[in-house]
Amino acid sequence: MDSMRSLLSTSDFLQVREHKLSNDLTVWLNEDHSQPKIFGAVVVKAGAKDSPNTGIAHYFEHMMFKGTDKIGTIDYESEKVLLDIIAEKYDALADTEDPKMRAHLQQIINDLSVRAAEYVIPNEFDRLISRFGGTKLNAGTSYDYTLYFNTFSPQYISQWAEINSERLVNPVFRLFQSELETVYEEKNMYGDTMASVAIEKLTERYFYPHPYAYPIIGSAENLKNPRLSEMRRFFEKYYVASNMGLILSGDFDTEEVLPILESTFSRIRKGKPPHRDIVTLPPFKGREKVSVRIPMPFVKIMALGFRGVPANHPDQVALNIAVSLLNNSNGTGFLDKLTVDHKVMGAMAVNQSMNEAGILGLLVFPKFFFQTYAAAEKLVWKQINRIKEGDFSDEMFQSLKLEQKREYASKLEDINSRAEVMMRIFSQGKSWQDYLDEVTRIDALSREDVIEIAKKYFTENYMYVTKKTGRYPKTILPKPDYSPIIPKNSDASSAYVERLEKIPVQELKPHFLDFEKDAEVVSLRPLVTLYKTHNSVNDIFSLTLSYGVGPVS
């Protein structure tokens, strides 16, 4: 691992070129010719915190699959007349409390939606992605950002850029009423999970008054009163080029790709990145007691919540080591030992950073029946104090630093996991070099750094959480009793497809795995064969053992 720092900064696979298009959209390009595929993503620095408790950021992510004024319709002008009225009716619905009037408005929306569906080509965006070499199409909404991504074949880079930039120019909120049912099902599904409501309650208590206090999907009340006009304003405010990033990792030539990206993604609307006022969380005052209800008899659950740090905080690297002294993937932490020695039923530590705040917490399961919360907490504090007093060996400290560096490097070994890191780092406002430099910061950490960090964050001001057996009232979003919205043009194609078909497909020379050239094959003994390849990304060694026994499935 001594050479890891240099490998992280010099390996061709790990070079990321950062570029800005003429509209200020940021592009990160990572060439990797080890496989004939490209991972492509658009990152928007807008998430649930920018629409707290409304669910708009999440709604909007769903609607981005419904097409544009060119994709997903056979006649947008006629469709738009109906969509505009539907948007007005949703605004009226949100302002109406009378049950009879609400039912009347919802029926009008349903009638209009059924008529508008006559112009819709369902799932055309998804079909276009598949048609031009794309797989694993997906998206996700977090508190801080929204991601749109998929993997595709390199010869279709021009088509991918055209489709995915068109998607962001003028998205159309069609089939909204039927999509509401999907979101309702998501919300109800979360409510069915045993501890989900308790986690929501804790999150609200921990983060209030920050927008992180509210669920990403939004409250049930807000989900029943969506405003398409607010969704449009959300798009206009946050989906501007300067607030977005384009991530590509895979088999392409940077100099050939940049003109393609400029001619497509530079169409996205320019605009200043939105201003945000960051809400600072107040410190806990002493031992703040909180109880939550979970329908799990006999099992005791306890948590200690401290104030963590945001993603860009300089203390994060040292805090990671301090937390790993308590709990780590190798099971060698002080809390891990409590579990192994049967002093508690289970214990783990959490150190998660969002862009504006972080979660630092310990979750403990006291032993069945006779162990009290007080006794379990005393054991946990004893382990915390060991770190604060420097009661850990140099061998353990160096081992955990080495493990941290290995985790950094292993995440960069393949295209998909590397692109995931690129998306996260971009969304946090960091450069790629910032990420690579964190390995240097791990190297520079001393025992004293970790001791001081433990003293700084594991204080006597914390949230003390215990579980009570019980459940919270369940809020069910009922499935609306409307006429089904069934588009009639499932086999149709928009005029936009003709435009895509005229774009030349690049020639791709296939590469087939040749075990004689791409791997060293060594016969160790009869029926024992070693297949060996060089890790050209970093100096991590990995070994997989496959036994030729059992049925072949």
Regions found by a protein language model. Name each.
Residues 143-147, 177-189:
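Short, glycine/charge-rich beta-strand/loop segments that flank catalytic centers
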Residues 62-73:
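Catalytic Zn2+-binding segment of zinc metalloproteases
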Residues 184-192, 280-294, 401-411:
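Short, conserved secondary-structure transition motifs
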Residues 173, 180-181, 195, 199, ...:
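Non-catalytic, conformational "gating/processing" segments within enzyme and secreted inhibitor domains
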Residues 28-30, 35-50, 56-59, 73-166, ...:
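M16 family metallopeptidases and their MPP-like homologs
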Residues 1-28, 253-293, 301, 336, ...:
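Proteolytic maturation boundary segments
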Residues 56-64, 322:
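Active-site His/Glu-centered metal-binding helix of metallohydrolases
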